[in-house]
Amino acid sequence: YYRKTKDLINEAPVAGLSGFADMGKQNIGSLKNTGVEVTLGFKPIQTKDWFWSIDYNFTYNKNEITDLSGVSEGGLPVLTGSNIDQSNKVLAHQKGYAANSFYVYQQVYDKNGRPIEGCVVDRNGDGDITEADRYLYKNIAAPVTMGLSSRLEYKNWDFSFTLRASIGNYVYNNFDQTMRLTSENAIWAQNAYLPNRPLNTLYWKSDHNTSKITDMFVQNASFLKCDNITLGYSFNNLFVKGFSGRVYATASNVFTITKYDGLDPEVVSGIDNNIYPRPFSFIFGLNLNF
């Protein structure tokens, strides 16, 4: 498929002379989506006592901003989304890039591959670290999503499960960055967590933030989740004719396989502020028909 959307609404800078806030909702541009969707269904077994069905779906989608007329001066990114602290945003739109890309500094690492706290690349080579050294890196949307469900029946028994995968989505681990901030209350612990930063570089009796918005905190949040597993048993003419039903047990949010460092890789906003994790649940149920 191919789809182009125009007059998209997003927050954009407003002229100071307007008398309104410095940001406001505007129709700022156009976006195109290209991709493919595939759905497959199989029934490998269909006999008197056995029945087995498998359903699979696959989606690939790529989006790209094609226009940001009137708000992107000189092709600079348009910041969007919520603040990750009191004043900074980490998501941005720019023509030629995917929507909601991460706008970050490039982290510097030592010879052992460990990040040097507060040290980022001077990308424009002017000798100063400014906003101009930030760049667009990855985005929050997964280009590939997949789903797999299956149901197996044997006489009165039934068993089913649902799996879901998201591949290529990224999350800004803001909780990880926040834990690296330096303050007078936490200064004693810094050598334990940051062995590559000398103690004499810290400021005593003051809040001093050396942590920056870098690509180190933009983490691959691809995942495979088992949304539910159900086991059931159906009965007919129990005790009296016409009295039927089904008893079942369902487990939800069974497991998650991911390399993401946070509690849950499925962060819709793309910014992880230590979200409340989805709980595992177990349900017993009984359906009666008479």
Where are the predicted features?
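Membrane-embedded beta-barrel scaffold of Gram-negative outer-membrane proteins
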Residues: 1-19, 50-54, 59
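Transmembrane beta-barrel outer-membrane domains
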Residues: 29-33, 139-143, 219-226, 275-279
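Outer-membrane beta-barrel and related beta-rich outer-membrane complex signature
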Residues: 8-13, 60-83, 169-192, 196, ...
